[in-house]
């Protein structure tokens, strides 16, 4: 039998002394208080605490925002005049080619009249919609003579899953079926 044996008994027997002595407790520096050798401590370096300046975590835009250009200062605000002043960029300095709402009004298409809706036949709209989704009207007319049966309409063999093909092994299983029978085992077998 293999195994490991560990003895929990200590080999050294501790003899108790009749006199009591106080144990030396180490100080912060790891030296006992009663130790006469270490009487002076020299500190060679002192770490200076550096205060970190907290910067705001925001991204300032390079150009003033359009909303701040149009904003009017409130009369009861306590900001100085320097903080309220907004510098408007010159037209040559502006990176944006913004001409205002009049440029947007020129690009709006004309409103469609009811007469134009009546000109488009409903059948034409339906075929256009189907062509946009990939329908080919010429392919439908050619294949109308040959009507193909869909996969779910075709008969398939019993006990065979979807997409599985019937093999000769599965045919032989149907003809020669032997059910499982439980047999009692005895000690002699």
From Swiss-Prot:
Bias (Basic residues) ranges: 10-26
GO biological process per UniProt: mRNA splicing, via spliceosome
Compartmental location: Nucleus
InterPro entries for the chain: Spp2-like, Spp2/MOS2_G-patch
GO cellular component: spliceosomal complex
Keyword Electron transport in record: no
Keyword annotations: mRNA processing, mRNA splicing, Nucleus, Spliceosome
Annotated region (Disordered), positions in chain: 1-28, 54-156
Superkingdom of origin organism: Eukaryota
Entry's family note: Belongs to the SPP2 family.
Function as written in the Swiss-Prot or TrEMBL entry: Involved in spliceosome maturation and the first step of pre-mRNA splicing.
Subunit details: Associated with the spliceosome.
Protein name: Pre-mRNA-splicing factor SPP2
Species per Swiss-Prot/TrEMBL record: Kluyveromyces lactis (strain ATCC 8585 / CBS 2359 / DSM 70799 / NBRC 1267 / NRRL Y-1140 / WM37)
UniProt lineage: Eukaryota, Fungi, Dikarya, Ascomycota, Saccharomycotina
């Amino acid at each position: 039998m293999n195994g490991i044996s560990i003895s929990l008994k200590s080999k050294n027997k501790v003899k108790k002394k009749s006199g009591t002595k106080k144990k030396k407790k180490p100080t912060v520096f790891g030296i006992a208080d009663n130790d006469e050798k270490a009487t002076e401590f020299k500190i060679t370096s002192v770490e200076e605490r550096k205060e970190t300046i907290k910067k705001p975590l925001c991204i300032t835009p390079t150009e003033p925002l359009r909303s701040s250009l149009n904003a009017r200062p409130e009369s009861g605000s306590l900001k100085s005049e320097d903080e309220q002043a907004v510098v408007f960029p010159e037209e040559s300095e502006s990176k944006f080619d913004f001409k205002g709402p009049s440029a947007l009004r020129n690009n709006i298409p004309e409103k469609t009249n009811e007469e134009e809706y009546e000109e488009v036949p409903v059948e034409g709209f339906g075929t256009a919609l189907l062509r946009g989704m990939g329908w080919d009207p010429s392919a439908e007319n050619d294949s109308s003579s040959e009507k193909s049966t869909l996969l779910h309409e075709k008969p398939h063999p019993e006990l065979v899953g979807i997409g599985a093909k019937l093999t000769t092994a599965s045919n032989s299983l149907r003809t020669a079926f032997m059910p499982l029978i439980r047999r009692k085992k005895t000690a002699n077998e």
